[in-house]
């Protein structure tokens, strides 16, 4: 369900997006350079004979009327969040199968995503992410769960344009639901769930 508010206090339903053959999860809204609302999420398929998850996007000019779904990214890679930087959309998808890795995608239109870095990180079980940009620098806050004896601590990644080479700093704590935003005074604000 998409909610809208004119004051941030009182909310009303603007739209309901459903799927007869999947469970829709973890919706996030961003705004494209053309001013469209872009709703991204994943579907957990009821029939998992071909794949278990797909990433999806819908578009709207007003928040009330939404396009049909667009399948984005690769099968079984969950694009956790899409972030626009200039005219390019970036998203990091995590493997829902056995590979236990994350992949960095880019898109010019938000409808067709191509891998920019096939294996962005692959130690432990990396999954949920938030990516922000400051000029030609990208920052990524990455959740990592314990897997095959590898630590489950979060990581902070830093990269310079064209964002194909990354350096990672271990944060020393397990995190969930990472998100980062730039606030008006120029500071970077990060929020996570601690375990």
What are the language-model segments listed below?
Residues 1-25, 30-195:
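Beta-rich carbohydrate-recognition and catalytic domains
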């Amino acid at each position: 369900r998409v909610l809208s508010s004119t004051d941030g206090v009182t909310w009303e339903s603007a739209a309901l997006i459903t799927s007869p053959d999947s469970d829709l999860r973890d919706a996030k809204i961003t705004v494209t350079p053309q001013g469209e609302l872009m709703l991204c999420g994943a579907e957990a398929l009821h029939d998992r004979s071909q794949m278990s998850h797909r990433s999806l996007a819908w578009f709207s000019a007003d928040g009330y009327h939404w396009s049909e779904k667009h399948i984005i990214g690769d099968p079984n890679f969950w694009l956790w969040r899409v972030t626009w930087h200039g005219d390019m959309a970036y998203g990091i998808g995590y493997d829902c199968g056995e590979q236990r890795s994350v992949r960095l995608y880019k898109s010019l239109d938000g409808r067709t995503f191509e891998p920019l870095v096939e294996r962005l990180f692959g130690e432990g079980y990396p999954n949920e992410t938030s990516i922000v940009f400051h000029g030609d620098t990208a920052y990524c806050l990455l959740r990592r769960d314990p897997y095959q004896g590898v630590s489950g601590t979060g990581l902070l990644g830093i990269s310079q344009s064209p964002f194909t080479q990354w350096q990672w700093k271990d944060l020393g704590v397990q995190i969930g639901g990472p998100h980062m935003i730039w606030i008006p005074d120029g500071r970077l604000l990060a929020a996570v769930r601690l375990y």
